[in-house]
Amino acid sequence: MDTERIGVGKIIGTHGIRGEVKVFPLTDFPERFRPGTRLILEQEGADGREGRTFPVTVISVRPGKGNLILKLAEINDADQAGAVRGATLKVEPWEVEPLPEGHYYIYQLLGSRVYTTGGEFLGILRDILATGANDVYVVRNEDAGEILIPALKTVVRQVDLARKEIRVELPPGLRD
């Protein structure tokens, strides 16, 4: 199992004088921020210095304009809130919300080796683009370059998280 923490929100600013923070959610599960929830705040250090990491507890949450406004128990004023701007709120991998069968988190798929159903190696899944209709897998291969693969059930035939492998059946003309 992955041991790297999973980002669920990005602190993008402060709100008011009582230490509330504006959070851009990185999750499709807003209940992740319900009062009483424990999260891990990770802040990168500047100029190569080590950043800060500490646990925080959500006291309250309410909707903002395109974001959420959170009050965290450990942040008590606007100065403290400003000091954590840019930090990421994370959870441990075993704390992620379970998904229905056949659905995956982006972090689970990135880095997977992608093959055709015939066994041809296409490359490594490096990015996933959200296009509205369906996601698109960005697969890169040092020799063949980049290929964009629609993330459709008719195309993505098998995902093996344990082996970090994805099998696809490319639509005709995709590589022409």
Curated annotation (Swiss-Prot):
Single GO MF annotation = ribosome binding
**The PRC barrel domain, residue ranges:** 101-174
One of the protein's GO biological processes:
rRNA processing
Spell out the subcellular localization from the entry. Cytoplasm
Question: What are the annotated GO cellular component locations?
Answer: cytoplasm; ribosome
Q: Which UniProt keywords apply?
A: Chaperone, Cytoplasm, Ribosome biogenesis, rRNA processing
Q: Does the keyword Transcription apply?
A: no
Q: Which Gene3D superfamilies match?
A: PRC-barrel domain, RimM
For this chain, the family text in UniProt reads: Belongs to the RimM family.
Q: Which NCBIfam families match?
A: 16S_RimM
Tell me, in a sentence or two, what this protein's role is: An accessory protein needed during the final step in the assembly of 30S ribosomal subunit, possibly for assembly of the head region. Essential for efficient processing of 16S rRNA. May be needed both before and after RbfA during the maturation of 16S rRNA. It has affinity for free ribosomal 30S subunits but not for 70S ribosomes.
**Subunit structure, per the record?**
Binds ribosomal protein uS19.
Copy the domain comment. The PRC barrel domain binds ribosomal protein uS19.
- Protein name (Swiss-Prot/TrEMBL): Ribosome maturation factor RimM
Q: Which organism is it from?
A: Moorella thermoacetica (strain ATCC 39073 / JCM 9320)
Species lineage: Bacteria, Bacillati, Bacillota, Clostridia, Moorellales
